[in-house]
């Protein structure tokens, strides 16, 4: 069975989202594309909330969100209980977000990273496991 990954982006992240979808489908993943579906200007919360809701409702699911800076869509996702969205701009940050913070959504800043950097971070994010241990204690303190 293919691993299902929800993905969403605003207009600034549309092109990168399409590249990510193609990359992951070639690797055998199934993507649930919540949009957007063009470069027409839209509002990032309309695409961040559905991804975050799906991750929130499904244990062990990982999601991908993209906007211009990554900030707005990341803030949107983190409003959901149980979602730990990490804004990543370097591969090491994506790795540590999973290993130490049990991040379940990666947020990417489309205007500030290359396609190659994005794909490397996503591959890392999807392959790295949470270390648990002392990190679990810290993650348990995140939710309000």
Name each model-derived stretch.
Residues 4-5, 60-63, 82-84:
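Short active-site oxyanion
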Residues 15-26:
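Short, solvent-exposed amphipathic alpha-helices that sit
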Residues 47-69:
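Short, structured active-site "lid" loops
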Residues 30-41:
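A short beta-strand-loop structural module common to alpha/beta enzyme folds
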Residues 17, 44, 48, 73-74, ...:
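A general structural signal for well-ordered alpha-helical segments in protein cores
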Residues 65-107, 111:
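Mid-chain, well-packed structural core segment of small domains
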Residues 1-5, 11-17, 43-46:
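Accessory recognition modules or surfaces
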Residues 6-8, 12-13, 91-144:
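C-terminal binding/interaction regions
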